[in-house]
Amino acid sequence: MPRSLKKGPFIDLHLLKKVEKAVESGDKKPIR
């Protein structure tokens, strides 16, 4: 869920990398 645009998006770098990997592999598992 995105935060308010005023505050800007909050995504941890390690979490972002996990998301990118999941998207690349088409993985549908929940990302922890």
UniProtKB/Swiss-Prot annotation:
Q: Which GO terms describe its molecular function?
A: rRNA binding; structural constituent of ribosome
Is Mitochondrion set as a keyword in this record? no
Asked if the keyword Nucleotide-binding belongs to this entry, the reply reads no
Cross-referenced InterPro entries: Ribosomal_uS19_SF (IPR023575)
Q: Which keywords fit this entry according to its UniProt record?
A: Ribonucleoprotein, Ribosomal protein, RNA-binding, rRNA-binding
- Per the UniProt entry, what are the Gene Ontology biological process annotations, in alphabetical order? translation
Q: Which domain of life is it from?
A: Bacteria
A cellular component term from Gene Ontology for this protein is:
ribosome
Family, similarity comment: Belongs to the universal ribosomal protein uS19 family.
Function statement: Protein S19 forms a complex with S13 that binds strongly to the 16S ribosomal RNA.
What name does UniProt use for this protein?
Answer: Small ribosomal subunit protein uS19
- Say which species the protein is native to: Yersinia enterocolitica
The organism that produces this protein has a lineage beginning with: Bacteria, Pseudomonadati, Pseudomonadota, Gammaproteobacteria, Enterobacterales
